[in-house]
Amino acid sequence: MTTTAVDLNILIDIVSADPTHGSSSRAAIERCALEGSLISSPEVVAEFAAGCRSASEAVGILQKLKVEYVEIGQWGAAVAGEVRGRKSSGGRIFADFLIAGHAVAHADRLLTRDLGFARMNVPGLVVVSPDSLLA
């Protein structure tokens, strides 16, 4: 069973029925769900909820998509801090380092369209995109 951390852009694609990425993001998340479990970090959930009408709506959507909320934990936060401390941010916001650290600590891979995560060179972070999964 493979655990997949889901990034914000995938959720937005699905909920907004994005004409360019919506169908591929939905197909990718469905495939990942068939292969194992889906999780999301506190940062992703908070950013997602900010775009919803209410916290209840955000939680309902995540439950419908079978995306489980998992705390980052001490190890995930430490990984994020270590990587951020060693590297220039390269324009990345700190939340991105927390999302990457969360994925390293709790998942086998991170599903995202933001391929900048791969360029972060976070040890142990496996980045997959809808395009790479569905190719």
Residue ranges of predicted features:
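Conserved glycosyltransferase catalytic-site signature
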Residues: L8, P42, A95-F97
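Short, well-structured N-terminal submotif of metal-dependent ribonuclease cores
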Residues: M1-S40, A49-G60, V128, L134-A135
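Residues at the C-termini of beta-strands that transition into short coil/loop
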Residues: P42, E71-G73, S129-D131
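Active-site neighborhoods of divalent-metal-dependent phosphate/nucleic-acid chemistry enzymes
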Residues: E68-L115
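Acidic, PIN/NYN-like endoribonuclease modules and their adjacent C-terminal/linker elements
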Residues: T3, A100, V104-A135
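A short acidic, often aromatic-flanked loop/helix-cap motif at beta-alpha or helix-coil junctions
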Residues: A46-E47, W75-V79, S132-A135
